[in-house]
Amino acid sequence: MVEVRHSRVIILGSGPAGYSAAVYAARANLKPLLITGMQAGGQLTTTTEVDNWPGDVHGLTGPALMERMREHAERFETEIVFDHINAVDFAAKPYTLTGDSATYTCDALIIATGASARYLGLPSEEAFMGKGVSACATCDGFFYRNKPVAVVGGGNTAVEEALYLANIASTVTLIHRRETFRAEKILIDKLNARVAEGKIILKLNANLDEVLGDNMGVTGARLKNNDGSFDELKVDGVFIAIGHTPNTSLFEGQLTLKDGYLVVQGGRDGNATATSVEGIFAAGDVADHVYRQAITSAGAGCMAALDTERYLDGLQNASE
């Protein structure tokens, strides 16, 4: 028989939004249950260096920051469960979440499931996934020590991946479909310095057309330039860094979405993190397509916990 566990508050996700919500909910004596999801710690576990977390003057790694957040949540007796939710039912209360290991019910839910790496959708990209194609330089970069690699993208993620790989690979070719990058100025300065050293090669106004390879894995990449011409690169690895997609497919048909993101109430009158179903709140990248920073996610997690506390207090007062 499948175990059914009930909690007043369940938090889905273990990134900055989830752990921040857990700290505040636990301090409010709501005894939250946090379900980690498949990637415990969220996107930051794949980030090498976090230099903009206030108070950490010398910076720290993403995994180290997430470990500290986990410890902080556990200090206030947040129960953390390593499970993956594959179905939800918000049609009736208590809300039901079905996981791989158990079934969970709750009076209130905070969704902090974050976002996942986006891919180009090329057949060759999928064919060589795990055989030379990756979306995480910190996870897979060590396989390419002293080997040539390519990074695709033009934002912060792409530049950060290229800078990281420049310390490992023989050369890094950064492929961007435009003439200029969208990354932060400090990252652009670092990028230009590595370009001057010859460690990073810029290939602008070009798109990845096909990943080339054989039975052993990736051997190259074919690029289509904006003028219609083609070039080929000899690389052993291709890293895709073109952004992320919110992890909301689980909630389609049950919560209101816009462009894949959960719609929250917003505003300055409280209940800003409320979704289209009462008692269900959202925080972090799952509801934010603009800022998408660790610190804004953590702040939204705090807001969601406070909104949840007020919601549960209202339920309790109504029943008395």
From Swiss-Prot:
Biological processes annotated in GO: removal of superoxide radicals
Any one of the GO CC terms: cytoplasm
Molecular function terms from GO: glucosaminate ammonia-lyase activity; thioredoxin-disulfide reductase (NADPH) activity
Domain of life: Bacteria
EC number: 4.3.1.9
Broadest EC class assigned to this enzyme: lyase
Keyword Disulfide bond applies: yes
Record's catalysed reaction(s): 2-amino-2-deoxy-D-gluconate = 2-dehydro-3-deoxy-D-gluconate + NH4(+)
Pfam families listed in its UniProt record: Pyr_redox_2
Disulfide bonds: 136-139
Keywords for the protein's UniProt record, in alphabetical order: Disulfide bond, FAD, Flavoprotein, Lyase, Oxidoreductase, Redox-active center
Residues bound to FAD: 36-43, 285-294
Keyword check for Ion transport: no
Sequence similarity: Belongs to the class-II pyridine nucleotide-disulfide oxidoreductase family.
PANTHER family xrefs: THIOREDOXIN REDUCTASE 1-RELATED-RELATED
Other information: The active site is a redox-active disulfide bond.
Function: Catalyzes the conversion of 2-amino-2-deoxy-D-gluconate (GlcNA) to 2-keto-3-deoxy-D-gluconic acid (KDGA) and ammonia.
Name the record gives this protein: Glucosaminate ammonia-lyase
Organism: Pseudomonas fluorescens
